[in-house]
Curated annotation (Swiss-Prot):
This is Putative homeobox protein NANOG2. Its main location: nucleus. GO terms for molecular function: DNA-binding transcription factor activity, RNA polymerase II-specific; RNA polymerase II cis-regulatory region sequence-specific DNA binding. GO terms for biological process: cell differentiation; regulation of transcription by RNA polymerase II; stem cell population maintenance. The gene is NANOGP1. CDD domains: homeodomain. Residues 168-232 are annotated as: Sufficient for strong transactivation activity. Residues 123-167 are annotated as: 8 X repeats starting with a Trp in each unit. It comes from Pan troglodytes. Pfam families: Homeodomain.
């Protein structure tokens, strides 16, 4: 009995296996090429180099290209090493100044809020200051009242002196002599009396201009109005 012969598949006629896609190929390539970070070589400075660098940084924080090259030649360092060191020192200096400023500002704020006495409330000092201010205000008001009273007293004294002055008495005497003139006197006596009265009026006018007081002006007007109808 013959067995059935299986069909043998040739390589040329056999179906091809499934090939990977381009995305899978790129993923495998990325997995194979894992990026390795290069560690930066840290420069180790000697004590002499650090001493020279710190001294130069205290005197000058920014160096020119020529100055950095000269300093690198003196210290047997590269230009990049000197430049990097100065950049790092400037950053450290700015950070230190900022932290120090924040500490000082916080200390000042806390010192202002703290009560130094610890026993008395804060408004007690304000009340005491207000009482002192009120006392000073009262003293100023009393002084101003005293000054006003002094000025009033001086004005009254000056008016009394003007009222009792010899100029006023002189005018009054001349007017009284004119008022006592008799109508039966001769014409020459009348003219002499009028001249005396005119001189008295001139004195009164000069006195009124000199003192410029309301009492003197009222007196002059009363005498001038009373004298005219009687002398005519």
């Amino acid at each position: 009995m013959d067995l059935p012969i299986e069909d043998s598949h040739d390589s040329s006629t056999s179906p091809k296996g499934k090939q990977p896609t381009t995305a899978e190929k790129s993923a495998t390539k990325k997995e194979d090429k894992v990026p390795v970070k290069k560690q930066k070589t840290r420069t180790v400075f000697s004590s002499t180099q650090l001493c020279v660098l710190n001294d130069r940084f205290q005197r000058q924080k920014y160096l020119s290209l020529q100055q950095m090259q000269e300093l690198s030649n003196i210290l047997n360092l590269s230009y990049k090493q000197v430049k990097t060191w100065f950049q790092n020192q400037r950053m450290k200096s700015k950070r230190w100044q900022k932290n120090n400023w924040l500490k000082n500002s916080n200390g000042v704020t806390q010192g202002c809020l703290v009560n130094p006495t610890g026993n008395l409330p804060m408004w007690s000092n304000q009340t005491w200051n207000n009482s002192i201010w009120s006392n000073e205000t009262q003293n100023i008001q009393s002084w101003s009242n005293h000054s006003w009273n002094t000025q009033t007293w001086c004005t009254q004294s000056w008016n009394n002196q003007a009222w009792n002055s010899p100029f006023y008495n002189c005018g009054e005497e001349s007017l009284q002599s004119c008022m006592q003139f008799q109508p039966n006197s001769p014409a020459s006596d009348l003219e002499a009396a009028l001249e005396a009265a005119g001189e008295g009026l001139n004195v009164i006018q000069q006195t009124a201009r000199y003192f410029s007081t309301p009492q003197t002006m009222d007196l002059f007007l009363n005498y001038s109005t009373n004298m005219q109808p009687e002398d005519v």
